[in-house]
Amino acid sequence: MQFPLSIISSLVTVLTITLQALPIFTLSTCRSFCGNIPIKYPFGIDDGCGAVQFRQMLNCSADLFFITPSGGYKVQSIDYNKKTLTVYDPAMSTCSILQPHHDFIMTDIQSAIMPPSADTVFALLNCSIDSPVLNHYKNLCFNFSGHSCDELYGGCNAFRVFHLLSNSSPPCCFTGYDTVRYMSMNILDCSHYTSIINTDNLKGLGPLDWVYGIKLSYSLPDTGCERCSESGGTCGFDTETQGMMCLCSSSFNATRECGKNC
Ligand SMILES: *[C@@H]1O[C@H](CO)[C@@H](O)[C@H](O)[C@H]1NC(C)=O
Ligand SMILES: *[C@@H]1O[C@H](CO)[C@@H](O)[C@H](O)[C@H]1NC(C)=O
Ligand SMILES: *[C@@H]1O[C@H](CO)[C@@H](O)[C@H](O)[C@H]1NC(C)=O
Ligand SMILES: *[C@@H]1O[C@H](CO)[C@@H](O)[C@H](O)[C@H]1NC(C)=O
């Protein structure tokens, strides 16, 4: 038996109208991984996800990058328990490679909410004798577990050149991020720097065994994310008003928690 053409045609019309009337559903907008790095609150790689204070700090293009005014730095790991994010700047000098210096610059917001951790030490190398950190600001340099400049110049292939060229040991300085933040390398008058993480237990360990990079220590904004995640939602924010929003499903966002919209 054949359906009369008119019935088929009206079915098609009804179907078309129904399909057009359906709201356009978007899939969950927050990716929870970038490669093998989990992305959780307060971070987000899709706009509207995570805490608004951390908006546009990460991008995920094959690898995860931390974006600052001085460039994108590859994220090595995020420790959500210790609230740290470790980045590595491939343009930075380390014990094994000497590269032209390149300031690490963060925005004011970044410096405020995720400054380098206390166990990240910056080593300013090959400083001129006129450097402020050897004169007026010499108290910014500290005793780094008894390590010396000569240890770096002598123990690292990359830094041996400082020793060779000057036939002596040019000064160096172990300091915290604030020194680098407030004075650019040009003002500091040191030709290179490197930074070392996890510095709490480096007494007696030579520079070949240090871990180079920058560890940022972030704080969680107090936006009521717990309530949202306990209700099964994902914390995000309204991209226009920047107000916190609880993302409940692909078709429903609540202001505070899923199940209630008040
Ligand atoms: C929910 O919020 C996200 C992030 O701001 C947004 O991308 C999405 O379009 C919103 N969905 C609805 C249904 O409003
Ligand atoms: C992400 O950051 C990296 C490093 O700065 C850059 O090369 C890449 O183009 C950025 N990707 C997007 C999608 O912005
Ligand atoms: C060390 O610093 C001096 C300036 O104080 C500079 O002329 C020299 O090129 C630097 N050495 C290297 C290997 O960059
Ligand atoms: C630096 O600290 C070490 C202990 O970590 C100590 O043995 C050494 O004497 C100190 N050096 C100076 C110059 O204060």
Task: Identify the role of each PLM range.
Residues 2-262:
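Extracellular/lumenal glycoprotein segments
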